Amino acid sequence: MPSSTEVIVLSSSSPDHIPSQTPAQSNYNPEKLFGLSPLSPSPPPLPSPSELFQPPTRSRFFKAQDEKAVVSSNTKQDSNTVAKANKPNATKRKAAASATGRSKKSKEDQTKGDTQTVIRGSNNALMKLDEEAPKKEPKARKKRSDAGVKRTLAKNRTITGKVAKSGSTQTDVTGLKAEEPVTFEPYLRKTDIEKAETRDIDDLQLDAAMKRRLDWTPTKDTRKQLVALDMVDGEPDQNRFGNLVSGYGYSNTSSDLEANSKRLEDGAATKRRRIELVESRVFPNVKHVLPDSARASKAPALEEKPNKRSKRITTLTGRVTALYVDDATDDSDSASAFTAAFGDVVNNASANRSSVQQRGKSSSRSHVIDSSVLPPEAAVSFLKEQDLVFGTCSQLEREDSPTMLRDMQMAIRASENDMTAEPKAYPATRPGSKFSDRATVSRFATPRKLWSVASRDLDGSLAQIEVLDMVNISKISELPLKSDDSPETAALTKGDTGYDAIETDTSFQEQSTTPAEKSPDDEKAVIKDPELSPPADCQLKEVVSKESAAPRIPQYAEFTDSQLSKEVKKFGFKSMRSRKKMVEVLEKCWESKHGATKAENQDMGKDIHAHQKAEPDTTRGQTKKRTRKTATLSETPKTRANPKIEPKASAHLKRRQAQEANEFSQASNSSFANVEEIEDSEDELIPSPSRLQNRYTLHSSETRGSQPLLVSDSPSSQERKNSESCIILSTFDAVAKPGMPDLSSQINKAVRAQPRSSSAGCKRPSWHEKILMYDPIILEDFATWLNTEGLGLVHEDREVSAGFLREWCESNGICCCFRKNNK
């Protein structure tokens, strides 16, 4: 009996739906062929971001598959029908695919596109349908089936197995299916992509990001609420000018106030050890005010156990700027110590202001410095009160006590004040010395007088020495006058050449001065030493003021030879060969015409002018011989007088001259110290300038020596003695003829006036040319030429020696030497 079979078609989307009859062939369109959804006239709405990035779930997955199955239900039915008709073609395609070496995945895709059929019964209608199927156009069906299979790749299939019975007659069909069981793997490419995308999206918090995207307004800074903490105290003077100006300065506070406040909430600072030299932790600029109870409770704790402050490196900048740092710049071991120290300072600010500022071991800066603008005067005074600390870092680290530094500075200031208030009275050189304790010798005297301390006199005692002005050496220095002394009794300093000042007798200095019956003749008879006297201008003014009405004697020494000869002819004399004789004759004639008394005043002014010209030519030889000159002067004092005293001179003038000579000899013998000097052997051969002048310039000494000296019986006044104590005769003025030109200037003229000469065809250089070529000048030869020929060229009758020429050469920077002695 024939066995009946049943054909069951298993569909992936609708397994329960089995068609009762063969469906009619439907028309194919792009939606059916390619699996596309039908086009809608309006574009589909965009999904929201929340739905787009929603993580996949199983409920969502199956829901989406059900919707697709409903949309393409008709297409699946048609594909099932075509699959049953093309079963032989499917087997042929599988064989061809295995022959061409297709991949396993492509085989599975092809088998997925075919419908799975199992024949279970004997249904004649279905069998006839299977037999008639190959009779149709296979090629067209093949292409359609291939296209349909390719188009249906995106469909999900259910897994089906072999359900044929063992007694099946269709061995060829069932055997083929048995050899290659078809299994279905769901296509999850889209879900895998979604999982990969959502794996990183879960942590991005995109919901909050979308909210921020819709609202672009910046968020408010919540930290601004902390500004209200500055107004806790509620001071009434918050709007004063000092606070307004301080707002423009650098506050040195961190921008992150919230972090600082959190760090101090626990009531103690961090315990880590800072290694930075600059304070990194900054307290907020808030004035802490503690209640009295809390302050009283914390004060004993601090007294019992003082906080130990670790030694840290200090610098000059840190010490100087320590007074200007706010509360937050110093270290504090705890917040309680900081507030307690602050409370103590507030209570004792008025009493211990200076000690609080210099407290080195305090845990914090106890006072709040309000920056204020001071007026210029107050600012300058404030800067003067500041203490500047100088030293190396190691010294500052060892000497960390500010009180020691302050005490040291106070001691230094006190010692300086004592030195300036009470200057030390240095001992004088002798009991009768003219230097007094009140007299200040140095022009550039300083409060400490360091240079004066280093100076000593001949006895080894300290002496005040004047500071010389070497630039303007020609100017005559002068000591400041005492308040009770007259200009005549002023102490005389050393001259331009650097000699020690000559001191007068003690008896003359101790006598008091009285105003005066002082005659004009007393001042006219004697001339002071220009090097040791007040300036010549002052002397000239005194002479001119007293004898302004008297005519002045002409300066015949400055006249030329022709002028002198004319003046001599006016008085009825013949022209003379010697210039010196003409000058003497003219002076005598003028004195006889105008009177001897008037001539004395003019003679005094004339000597001052003559000596002013000779002052610049001072030499080192004169400096060495100063002591010898003073000794010679004390032994042979000579009074200055006219070469020839006219009969008209009064007897009173003669008596004064004799008295002056006696008094000067007594004063010089009592005041000069006979100092023995060890001179070189060469210097012994050189005569002193005073001897040279005595040798060559005294032509009227015999006449002056023959004059009798009349001594007056009437004693002179005390004022006269006091004024004579400071009057010293110059060796040059005592022996030199008034009105004579300087011998050094005459030598200069003679050297330049020498004519060039040549002997035996060889040119001999003149003395001037030798000097210009820096040839050594033999002093003996030079003196011989000047005495025989040179000085005669300039009408000079005086003679010079080798010693005087040596001084002249040294003063002018000329190379000179003596002739060698072959002994």
Curated annotation (Swiss-Prot):
CDD domains: SAP_SLX4
Segments for region (Disordered): 1-177, 480-499, 505-538, 591-722
GO cellular component: Slx1-Slx4 complex
GO terms assigned for molecular function: 5'-flap endonuclease activity
Protein name in the entry: Structure-specific endonuclease subunit slx4
Biased composition (Polar residues): 19-29, 71-83, 113-125, 505-516, 659-673, 690-706
Post-translational modification: Phosphorylated in response to DNA damage.
Function: Regulatory subunit of the slx1-slx4 structure-specific endonuclease that resolves DNA secondary structures generated during DNA repair and recombination. Has endonuclease activity towards branched DNA substrates, introducing single-strand cuts in duplex DNA close to junctions with ss-DNA.
